[in-house]
């Protein structure tokens, strides 16, 4: 028998699907552009709608910091953000979808930190390890929040495909900048993708408590050296 909370959530979800009051989150095309230009959830959204969207994501991030993945509940997000439950579902069909958007925002912040600075290191592998180390240190500073974000990344379904695609594109862009190339070759692109996959799989193990941050960096160091050895970097 469904609980009252389950029934309320179902009604809110169905109501949000039939409502035209709020715009849906943009598709995969141009999502990073919307994020960087402050236009989420869509180019046609009005200022109050964008402000509500940001409040919802911020509420989810705050709850994650306070209690980790399990503390991020749709009703709690609505209450914290001061919006109706249906509005939350209008933007995000699940908390995993919402937290993946939060993860995308965090990693965009990481990318922007290094956008206009000279990254230390004499070789591409040294520069990538520097960026990986600095970014992993950021994650360690608020472990409950970033555990929640990584768990959401693990559990996300097709409803978050636009955010997941944008995340992959962002990682590629960040590492391409790090190795210092404008036009990335196929071999470099494959190397970057391998490093990104190793980083995320190591973070999954960190979230599960199987390895420490030092071990994350040891795994990354080995992967970077092996991958870039054949590229001469």
Predicted regions and their residues:
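Amphipathic alpha-helical packing segments from all-alpha helical-bundle domains
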Residues: 111, 157-200, 214-229
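Short hydrophobic clusters on alpha-helical segments that form packing/core surfaces
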Residues: 52, 56-64, 110, 135, ...
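N-terminal intrinsically disordered/low-complexity leader segments
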Residues: 1-51, 232-233
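Helix-turn-helix
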Residues: 55, 63-97, 101
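Amphipathic alpha-helical segments used for helix-helix packing
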Residues: 136-158, 165, 173-176, 201-205
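Short glycine/proline-centered loop/turn elements that form peptide/ligand docking sites
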Residues: 38-39, 43-44, 71-73, 95, ...
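Short, basic, alpha-helical segments at the C-terminal edge of helix-turn-helix-like DNA-binding modules
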Residues: 104-111
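Hydrophobic alpha-helical connector segments
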Residues: 101, 115-141, 195, 217
